[in-house]
Amino acid sequence: MAGRILLGLTLLATSLPLLAMGDAAVVPCISYSTVPGYFLQDDPAVDPKTFDYAKEGFGLIDQAYDTDETLDAELKKLPWRRFEHKVRSLNKHAASNVRFAVLFLGRHGQGFHNVAEAYYGTKAWDDYWSKLDGDGTITWSDAHLTEEGISQAKVARDTWAGQMKNSIPLPEVYYTSPLDRCLATAKFTFSKLELPPSKPFIPTVKELLRETLGVHTCDRRSSRNYIESTYPTYKIEPGFTQKDMLWDPEVRESDSDRDARLKKLLDDIFSHDKSTFMSLTAHGGAIRSILNVIGHREFGLQTGAVIPVLIRIETSTDAPEDPEEDLTIKIQGLN
């Protein structure tokens, strides 16, 4: 079964582009770093346990930028417009292999698995209950949102609506985990917002954006047919299988393997998507890995919370890989 995880990740990894150079292939190498100083969550003095993203308007720091002088006087009054102008200026003046992007990372609202873990305790949950589909009272296989979870997603919706009045730059693209709690959170957060026709809410379901793989049934996704019928307006990425090929009932993904998987996800996104402002609806563990990959300080999110991050993306190329040379080396190694 563990081989299925490796096979699935390998197949997904092959979707990343290779740049042809004669008979050799150049493998794009993408590195990420956080650009700090724009959001309160960047500050080590800010406590994630008490921080209220909704009250803080997603945490944008109201400050002057060196690009303000090129804005109209009225737009200078709007912190989000000044921030957007700054980000677009960074991209305008960046090297050809460098770009900047803003990720709005949203954790799903409370799911039934969260309720069960709180009720039974983490040890009993990890040792026993998480391996079952439910306890006879509630079901947590591919856990759905509770009423509280739906309310949390609507808080995120209201926060977006409030900041839209302050000219927040809207996501140009939406991505979501294929697990139901994220699919539903994205729907309750964005589907009722008055978005412009140029930036509609049509999320793309990304297999690699899901929570830690294996063992816990709450992290086993439903079939492709279920997702397509329940969320008919969502797009599903190419290669998305009917059945869950990544979940293993015997093997739980390590934190380092999860980091590597989320790095592949970011590589896939930034190899194909030129958007600057992006929304990703995901999980506590997945977001923890993304923050680790981009070099952000650790910042745990409560269910339903959102953290924005400004990141720098740099693409370089490794030395060309020559299949014939590689084969020669292997043959020589047999002598």
Curated annotation (Swiss-Prot):
The annotated active site, in chain numbering, is 108 (tele-phosphohistidine intermediate), 211 (proton donor/acceptor)
List the signal peptide residues.
Answer: 1-24
Could you name the domain of life of the organism this protein comes from? Answer: Eukaryota
List GO molecular-function terms, semicolon-separated: isomerase activity; phosphatase activity
The EC number on file is: 5.4.-.-
The keyword Iron-sulfur appears for this protein = no
Q: Which InterPro entries match?
A: His_Pase_superF_clade-1, His_PPase_superfam, PGM_Phosphatase
Gene3D superfamilies under this entry?
Phosphoglycerate mutase-like
User: Does Oxidoreductase show up as a keyword for this record?
Assistant: no
Q: Per the record, where is site Transition state stabilizer?
A: 283
**According to its UniProt record, where is this protein located?**
Secreted
Q: Which UniProt keywords apply?
A: Isomerase, Secreted, Signal
Q: Cellular component GO terms, alphabetically?
A: cytoplasm; extracellular region
Q: Say what the protein does.
A: Probable phosphomutase that may have a function related to the manipulation of phosphate groups on carbohydrates.
**Xref: PANTHER family:** BROAD-SPECIFICITY PHOSPHATASE YOR283W-RELATED (PTHR48100), HISTIDINE PHOSPHATASE FAMILY PROTEIN-RELATED (PTHR48100:SF1)
Entry similarity comment: Belongs to the phosphoglycerate mutase family.
| Protein name from the UniProt record | Probable phosphoglycerate mutase ARB_03491
